[in-house]
Amino acid sequence: MTQPIEIRAAIEATEELAAAFARLIPQLSAAMPPDLAALREIVASPSNTVLLAYDLASGKIVGTLTLVVCRIPTAIRAWIEDVVVDAAARGRGVGEALTREGLRLAAERGAASVELTSRPAREAANRLYERLGFVRRATNVYRYSVTAADRPPA
């Protein structure tokens, strides 16, 4: 039997949250997980909502999604970032529950659209996003990596 999941927004950055990110982010990316200080900034930002999926049986955080909503000149836009579900909790609807809550909050905040990116290799995630109504865009995604040389001297 599948254990129930509850989705909650992070209210504050805690050691529990830092430990969850330390466990989850490596399952998504080679990026270093945020430390407690960085999580405090992320959670405190009025543009961000960090959603957490709790396994109610264990009380453990088993997934996360960050929703970013901001006004730009053309509209209020939303981005879903860093969706990750613990490998042990996959197949239980955790990613869907997180994404649906992110979409609900984006609509509640007046977003005209919600963007996300997902690597092609994440086949199950891509199927989920398409099933939820996301459509692939005919656009290029570019990344510029800021280096120390780009930053002004201290």
Predicted regions and their residues:
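Conserved active-site alpha-helix within GNAT-family acetyltransferase domains
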Residues: E96, P120-V146
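Short helix-loop capping/hinge motifs at secondary-structure junctions, enriched
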Residues: A148-R151
